[in-house]
């Protein structure tokens, strides 16, 4: 307080108080103390006995967001529902909107429940999958890679799925979202069949709630760069793109020789380092019916035992629905390991019958059509009773072969004797005939899932698999009394790790600590706890020690090899060419990622960290060049166009530039820095997110002193990942129809865009001879052109001139 006499003199109360609560502050300069009487008292006899309202009671309860009907007319893979869960929860009918509408940003997880109510006379199944961002071009048959639940009319009538916050940005903007966080897709996994007189539909309800809800940015209610690393010239004429050690950049566009720290905060903590993240997940490979007309001993299905097998297709959208296992293995020359077949049945409670599964060692060419049921019992076999609470038989085929590895024969059409892909065939027999009352369907559909244990692939290549010539079908369910984490990354790493060499991978185990699963072949794939039990169908020895000191299935080793990105040719002097590095799967080559890069960057939801770029210069030229990297969101020249640069040299060098001369170097290796305003970038986004959150950055190359004495000047660019690259949250692999290859080498030669990793080899004698010719005939090209024109004019004069009669 000021002096009382001073207050009287200035005729004002000289007291300043700062008051307020939470996000409201008031500064009062003529203030008095707060008048306060009494204090808050608890009630001895409560007026209301419910819990006081809070963020948890209001914002984290379940709300009914959707109802639908699953009809018998819905075909396999038909999308019963496609829901933007967060958008549906942001609804004035739900109490949670009272919190959300007064905040700008939020971080949250989502939990959903999908409920159906089938009768005992209905059979079939649905898959419910939570897809981050957008389904994009992912294979439908690989939806089990995502957090998912399987609904089987005979097993379960509810699934629960809980997912974390997965986003390229640190928070979700409610009023102007860049793209959806989570999309719930519900598809037919096995068609609905009904008994006589039963309803031709099953009703379906979807409940959803926020979990771990964090709200930020109170708002009034309203109506609705730098540079990286670059090594100029490995050697003048040779650059190795084959492996991580030689393909990585030793110089950087970054401001400093800096590193990027790991951050899993927006990726749900699910960091991926190894391709076994995908190969260990059972995904749908085929579907076949078990008919009442099948006789005992009849072969119902024959499947080659190789990881490339898949038969599922879809018409809307048009897809060859590759399995996750085939998607990974198609990119390698050789494979070995134990393949796991999951056979999931969709009966009613009134169907009864048995199937026998038999493995015949050999190769894909052996004839098994004459093997009888009795003969089949000699080979490794298992019998499954389709009746009861267990829906799934897990058949783990042990590695039995005459070679330590099998070869990927699908890359060519002609084969030599001894080149085999499969280690035999798996035959499905009718063991006991299917029996049922006359008022239910006379068939039971069986879904075939494929995954692998102790898988080792090596020697990378690029190949897009086609479907195997047969047919299939599938469905599933989900027990939810206990929560379990699905698809934990890198559960095991082939046979190259100490863990596998000790044989632990052969022990049945469950995801929940302290609970040991019974070891056996029968299980319930609908239950995510039981689905994670490592299969153990037959006794096996340890696989032994790998011949390779390097694990080719490591993402860092595989993608540390440089893969082709793009190529372009300059036609005139003082021009620049800019190309964005965009991960979007909606952009086709040459402006989108081609081939291996396209396949790889769509295997996961989020990418963060630097990238290494190798630029190969082709053509005998003496040209000065400059390259620079521009982070997303800044001024840049028009992409994919050869043009004069509109940017100043000050701007380019401030971003970080590298100068080079094409006579002195044939290649540049650059580390592109992770300079972004985003948490991560993604290749599978919808809407505006596909334009902003899918681009890593832009690379520009400018040339000077290019003249007619130079040959064509072409640049080819190759991309590889670094040791600081991070990949978060697995996605369903791209379906085969969406795999886009680059143009052929002959196409590029025709366009003058040679894809070459070396300069033209010229000896010292060649150079002396060329310089001698140039001195003697400095205008050779011009004189040749003049000669052509003179010959043309002479021929025209001859044709117009009347020749004199010949002399006698």
From Swiss-Prot:
<keyword id="KW-0406">Ion transport</keyword>
<dbReference type="InterPro" id="IPR033703">
    <property type="entry name" value="Rhv-like"/>
</dbReference>
<feature type="site" description="Cleavage">
    <location>
        <begin position="2"/>
        <end position="3"/>
    </location>
</feature>
<keyword id="KW-0946">Virion</keyword>
<keyword id="KW-1039">Host endosome</keyword>
<dbReference type="GO" id="GO:0015267">
    <property type="term" value="F:channel activity"/>
</dbReference>
<keyword id="KW-0945">Host-virus interaction</keyword>
<comment type="similarity">
    <text>Belongs to the picornaviridae polyprotein family.</text>
</comment>
<dbReference type="GO" id="GO:0039618">
    <property type="term" value="C:T=pseudo3 icosahedral viral capsid"/>
</dbReference>
<feature type="site" description="Cleavage; partial; by host">
    <location>
        <begin position="744"/>
        <end position="745"/>
    </location>
</feature>
<dbReference type="InterPro" id="IPR029053">
    <property type="entry name" value="Viral_coat"/>
</dbReference>
<feature type="short sequence motif" description="(L)YPX(n)L motif">
    <location>
        <begin position="146"/>
        <end position="150"/>
    </location>
</feature>
<feature type="short sequence motif" description="(L)YPX(n)L motif">
    <location>
        <begin position="179"/>
        <end position="184"/>
    </location>
</feature>
<feature type="region of interest" description="Disordered">
    <location>
        <begin position="34"/>
        <end position="55"/>
    </location>
</feature>
<keyword id="KW-1160">Virus entry into host cell</keyword>
<dbReference type="InterPro" id="IPR024354">
    <property type="entry name" value="Hepatitis_A_VP1-2A"/>
</dbReference>
<dbReference type="GO" id="GO:0005198">
    <property type="term" value="F:structural molecule activity"/>
</dbReference>
<protein>
    <recommendedName>
        <fullName>Genome polyprotein</fullName>
    </recommendedName>
</protein>
<dbReference type="GO" id="GO:0034220">
    <property type="term" value="P:monoatomic ion transmembrane transport"/>
</dbReference>
<dbReference type="Pfam" id="PF00073">
    <property type="entry name" value="Rhv"/>
</dbReference>
<keyword id="KW-1143">T=pseudo3 icosahedral capsid protein</keyword>
<feature type="site" description="Cleavage; by protease 3C">
    <location>
        <begin position="224"/>
        <end position="225"/>
    </location>
</feature>
<keyword id="KW-0813">Transport</keyword>
<dbReference type="GO" id="GO:0033644">
    <property type="term" value="C:host cell membrane"/>
</dbReference>
<feature type="site" description="Important for VP1 folding and capsid assembly">
    <location>
        <position position="748"/>
    </location>
</feature>
<keyword id="KW-1182">Viral ion channel</keyword>
<feature type="site" description="Cleavage; by protease 3C">
    <location>
        <begin position="470"/>
        <end position="471"/>
    </location>
</feature>
<dbReference type="GO" id="GO:0019062">
    <property type="term" value="P:virion attachment to host cell"/>
</dbReference>
<keyword id="KW-1161">Viral attachment to host cell</keyword>
<keyword id="KW-0407">Ion channel</keyword>
<keyword id="KW-0167">Capsid protein</keyword>
<dbReference type="Pfam" id="PF12944">
    <property type="entry name" value="HAV_VP"/>
</dbReference>
<dbReference type="GO" id="GO:0072494">
    <property type="term" value="C:host multivesicular body"/>
</dbReference>
<dbReference type="InterPro" id="IPR001676">
    <property type="entry name" value="Picornavirus_capsid"/>
</dbReference>
<dbReference type="GO" id="GO:0046718">
    <property type="term" value="P:symbiont entry into host cell"/>
</dbReference>
């Amino acid at each position: 307080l000021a002096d009382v006499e001073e207050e009287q003199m200035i005729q004002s109360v000289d007291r300043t108080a700062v008051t307020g609560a939470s996000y409201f502050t008031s500064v009062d300069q003529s203030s008095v103390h707060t008048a306060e009487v009494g204090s808050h008292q608890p009630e001895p006899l409560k007026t209301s006995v419910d819990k006081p309202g809070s963020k948890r009671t209001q914002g984290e309860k379940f709300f009914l967001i959707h109802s639908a009907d699953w009809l018998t007319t819905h075909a396999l893979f038909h999308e019963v529902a496609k829901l933007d869960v967060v958008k549906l929860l942001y609804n004035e009918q739900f109490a949670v909107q009272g919190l959300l509408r007064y905040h700008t940003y939020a971080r949250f997880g989502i939990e959903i429940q999908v409920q159906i109510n089938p009768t005992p006379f209905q059979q079939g199944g649905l898959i419910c999958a939570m897809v981050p961002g957008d389904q994009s071009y992912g294979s439908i048959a690989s939806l089990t890679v995502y957090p998912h639940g399987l609904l089987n009319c005979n097993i379960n009538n509810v699934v629960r799925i809980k997912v974390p916050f997965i986003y390229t940005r640190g928070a979700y903007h409610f009023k102007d979202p860049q793209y959806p966080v989570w999309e719930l897709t519900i598809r037919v996994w096995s068609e609905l069949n009904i008994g006589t007189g039963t309803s031709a539909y099953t009703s379906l309800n979807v409940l959803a709630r926020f979990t771990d809800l964090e709200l930020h940015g109170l708002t009034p209610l309203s109506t609705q760069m730098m540079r990286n690393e670059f090594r100029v010239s490995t050697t003048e004429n040779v650059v190795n793109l084959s492996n991580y050690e030689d393909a990585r950049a030793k110089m950087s566009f970054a401001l400093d020789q800096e590193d990027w720290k790991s951050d899993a905060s927006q990726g749900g903590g699910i960091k991926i380092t190894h391709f076994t993240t995908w190969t260990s997940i059972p995904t749908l490979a085929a579907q076949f019916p078990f008919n009442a007309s099948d006789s005992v001993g009849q072969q119902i299905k024959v499947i080659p035992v190789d990881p490339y097998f898949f038969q599922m297709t879809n018409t809307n959208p048009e897809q060859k629905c590759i399995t996750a296992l085939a998607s990974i293995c198609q990119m390698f020359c050789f494979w070995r390991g134990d393949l796991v077949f999951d056979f999931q049945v969709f009966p009613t409670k009134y169907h009864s019958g048995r199937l026998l599964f038999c493995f015949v060692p050999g190769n894909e060419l052996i004839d098994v059509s004459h093997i009888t049921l009795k003969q089949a019992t000699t080979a490794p076999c298992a019998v499954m009773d389709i009746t009861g609470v267990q829906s799934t038989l897990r058949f783990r085929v042990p590695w039995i072969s005459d070679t330590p590895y099998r070869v990927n024969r699908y890359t060519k059409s002609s084969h030599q004797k001894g080149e085999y892909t499969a280690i035999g065939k798996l035959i499905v027999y009718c063991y006991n005939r299917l029996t049922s009352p006359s008022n239910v369907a006379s068939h039971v559909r069986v879904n075939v899932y494929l995954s692998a244990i102790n898988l080792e692939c090596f020697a990378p290549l690029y190949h897009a698999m086609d479907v195997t010539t047969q047919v299939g079908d599938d469905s599933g369910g989900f027990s939810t009394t206990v929560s379990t984490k699905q698809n934990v990354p890198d559960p095991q790493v082939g046979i190259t790790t100490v863990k596998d060499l000790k044989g632990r991978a052969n022990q049945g185990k469950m995801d929940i600590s302290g609970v040991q699963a019974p070891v056996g072949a029968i299980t319930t794939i609908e239950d995510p706890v039981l689905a994670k039990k490592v299969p153990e169908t037959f006794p096996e020895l340890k696989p032994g020690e790998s011949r390779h000191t390097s694990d080719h299935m490591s993402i860092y080793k595989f993608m540390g090899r440089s893969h082709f990105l793009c190529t372009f040719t300059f036609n005139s002097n003082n021009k620049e060419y800019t190309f964005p590095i965009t991960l979007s799967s909606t952009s086709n080559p040459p402006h989108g990622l081609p081939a291996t890069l396209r396949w790889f960057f769509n295997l996961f939801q989020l990418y963060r960290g630097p990238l290494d770029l190798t630029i190969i210069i082709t053509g005998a030229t003496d040209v000065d060049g400059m390259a620079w990297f521009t982070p997303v969101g800044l001024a840049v020249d028009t992409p994919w166009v050869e043009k004069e640069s509109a940017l100043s040299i000050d701007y380019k060098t401030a971003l970080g530039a590298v100068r080079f001369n094409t006579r002195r170097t044939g290649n540049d290796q650059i580390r592109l820095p992770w300079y972004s305003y985003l948490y991560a970038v993604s290749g599978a986004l919808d809407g505006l997110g596909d334009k902003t959150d899918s681009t890593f950055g832009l690379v520009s190359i400018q040339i000077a002193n290019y003249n007619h004495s130079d040959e064509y000047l072409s640049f080819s660019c190759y991309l590889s990942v670094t040791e600081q690259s991070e990949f978060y949250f697995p996605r369903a692999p791209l379906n085969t129809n969406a795999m886009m290859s680059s143009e052929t080498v002959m196409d590029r030669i025709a366009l003058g865009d040679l894809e070459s990793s070396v300069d033209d080899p010229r000896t010292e004698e060649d150079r002396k001879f060329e310089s001698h010719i140039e001195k003697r005939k400095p205008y050779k090209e011009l004189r040749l052109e003049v000669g052509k024109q003179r010959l043309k004019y002479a021929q025209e004069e001859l044709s117009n001139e009347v020749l004199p009669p010949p002399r006698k």
